[in-house]
Amino acid sequence: MMAALYPSTDLSGASSSSLPSSPSSSSPNEVMALKDVREVKEENTLNEKLFLLACDKGDYYMVKEILEENSSGDLNINCVDVLGRNAVTITIENENLDILQLLLDYGCQSADALLVAIDSEVVGAVDILLNHRPKRSSRPTIVKLMERIQNPEYSTTMDVAPVILAAHRNNYEILTMLLKQDVSLPKPHAVGCECTLCSAKNKKDSLRHSRFRLDIYRCLASPALIMLTEEDPILGAFELSADLKELSLVEVEFRNDYEELARQCKMFAKDLLAQARNSRELEVILNHTSNDEPLDKRGLLEERMNLSRLKLAIKYNQKEFVSQSNCQQFLNTVWFGQMSGYRRKPTCKKIMTVLTVGIFWPVLSLCYLIAPKSQFGRIIHTPFMKFIIHGASYFTFLLLLNLYSLVYHEDKKNTMGPALERIDYLLILWIIGMIWSDIKRLWYEGLEDFLEESRNQLSFVMNSLYLATFALKEEAHNKFHDFADRKDWDAFHPTLVAEGLFAFANVLSYLRLFFYVYTSSILGPLQISMGRMLQDFGKFLGMFLLVLFSFTIGLTQLYDKGYTPKEQKDCVGIFCEQQSNDTFHSFIGTCFALFWYIFSLAHVAILCTRFSYGEELQSFVGAFIVGTYNVVVVIVLTKLLVAMLHKSFQLIANHEDKEWKFARAKLWLSYFDDKCTLPPPFNIIPSPKTICYMISSLSKWICSHTSKGKVKRQNSLKEWRHLNEKRDENYQKVMCCLVRRYLTSMRQKMQSTDQATVENLNELRQDLSKFRNEIRDLLGFRTSKYAMFYPRN
């Protein structure tokens, strides 16, 4: 029988020389006895082997014959092979759906049948298992199949449910079938949750608890599940990616897994947006506001561009979504507005347009102040024109700062409390305008969103320094009226402090120009790289300060006892030709010496001592400490800093287009609303538009207390609700179209890959096997059920 099973092997005629020698004829050191130490299951009978082999070959008629002959129940239809697979599992793996239906009708059972079908992504098998009804019951066995498998021998992770496994495979069709069965998922708790359930699970098995949370989030991050269960898939992907990013910082053991899932959610949102085919669909998607977000009622009634979804994408740091081509094209359209012809102009005309607007920006601001709703005012209101006008206003402010040093009077040099000049009052007007602009932005955006922008942080510090400068100048003018040489002034004289703050504020004012280069495709990526390098330098600074503090303490303790009295010193300072170690007698002096030693500005004599004879050991220790500092800081840490900066630059360079477009979009969005149209100092003048809005709001408030006003208010609310419902309905229609296109594109990608080729080959093999068995049965080649073991000539 075994020879028939293996016809290619001639066991009887095998040469004895080809077989290994018996252990008795060899030395014990030359052979190694092999023994199966695993659990040996009960060997199957011949009929059971035939039954499993027929299922594996896909022989429907043989399986049916064996099951019909098993009236006495001698055959164990739930038997398993050496791999632990029963007939149902084998049939599912081979995708023999007709045999699977036959086995289920005869009562074959498998606890993990549904999981095997989902894992193999056999959609037909999943459908059969979910809809199968036993002969003695009118209800399908779905309840048992949908239970979580807790068998550690199963190939997938423990505590796995069918819906979780289907989401891991990202199979849209299978998930659709499972969701019709009213399935549910346990809501994952926070990592630091101390509830009774989480405490018990952590105490019992912390690894299992963490892995189960990871499986749940891997399920939730499935694009197919997001499309099926989320009314707003884009918002769901945004929120889930933020949660996964936060989890990656907490559960560092699974950081790579959570970061990969967060990246998957970001790419899904980007790919879903890429399915938009026209500007109308993009407008509906990018202007949609969720129920949790504040809604601009006036903007909704006026059909104004609010770009709420785009602002939310920037808040959640969705760089892939914002830098997507469709989104960027829509942003360009909104950015130029009625100046759309500017992009098609030659370079010379572009420069002339910018210079003209930059020179006549005060006139343009006055025109908008007088007639904001006119055709000319609407052109000025476009984001592109606002950007140029605000930039020209800021350049004028910098010009006033340069003029400030030119109008400085030498005769007031020793005046302890000089009066403010005319240019000071001009600067104060600009500063008040910039502060008012920041206050309005803070009011509409909120403190958290306002402080997230580094541009707002720099503006806040700069304006605070200018306010402190002029406040100190005014205080000095009121308190001091004398003349004296500056060297006789107090170190913290208000005028001196004001000049120091003013100098630092001037530096920040010019550094603020870096934020304007984001609009340039050449300088923008360099600015982003510089910002990332500054972050890396902050990390490096913490390590450097620790090393500096360690060596400073050691050198100070070593040389403090050898401090030379002042009258015996030849000179002081680390740049002295006759330098001594007296620099190291204090903590501050040692810090300065070691810091400048990095830049080779400390004298070589820093290694010498002024100890007397017999204290060579202290001299050697001091030289060894400084030498070690030289190796650790000058050689190792500085090279580490260079490597960190190079890595940051390379990281930005690899994603240059994405990083630049995201940074540019953040800058552009600050000019899209109508909150800060006029630049400083014209924004501090009450405009007719503001007065009209105030009068309109006041009249509405007064009318709301009358009977007619209440009716009008109710009608306005009904109109607003109707528009809101219509907006949500349009959004759902567009989203359904995007989901269908996304599924179609994914199906086309799968058909063009090797996986589709393998699936086609499997289908061809199944068809050929089924055709062979049918022909054999029709021609009567099978004389007995054991004939399939024997080869035919």
From Swiss-Prot:
Q: Which residues lie within the membrane without crossing it?
A: 346-379
Give me the ANK repeat coordinates as residue ranges: 46-75, 83-109, 111-156, 158-180
Listed disulfide bonds for this chain?
C571-C576
* Subcellular localization(s) per the UniProt record: Cell membrane
GO MF entries: inositol 1,4,5 trisphosphate binding; store-operated calcium channel activity
- Where along the sequence do coiled-coil regions lie? none
CC annotations in GO: cation channel complex; plasma membrane
Q: How is its activity regulated?
A: May be operated by a phosphatidylinositol second messenger system activated by receptor tyrosine kinases or G-protein coupled receptors. Also activated by intracellular calcium store depletion.
Quaternary data: Heterotetramer with TRPC4 and/or TRPC5. Forms a heteromeric ion channel with TRPC4, with a 1:3 TRPC1:TRPC4 stoichiometry. Unlike other TRP channel proteins, does not form a homomeric channel. Interacts with TRPC4AP. Interacts with ITPR3. Interacts with MX1 and RNF24. Interacts with FKBP4. Interacts with PLSCR1. Interacts with PKD2L2. Forms a heterotetramer with PKD2 with a 2:2 stoichiometry; has distinct channel properties separate from PKD2 or TRPC1 homomers alone.
Family designation? Belongs to the transient receptor (TC 1.A.4) family. STrpC subfamily. TRPC1 sub-subfamily.
Sum up the protein's function in the record's words.
Forms a receptor-activated non-selective calcium permeant cation channel. Forms a heteromeric ion channel with TRPC4 or TRPC5 that has reduced calcium permeability compared to the homomeric TRPC4 or TRPC5 channel. Also permeable to monovalent ions including sodium, lithium and cesium ions.
Designated name of the protein: Short transient receptor potential channel 1
Task: Name the source organism.
Answer: Bos taurus (Bovine)
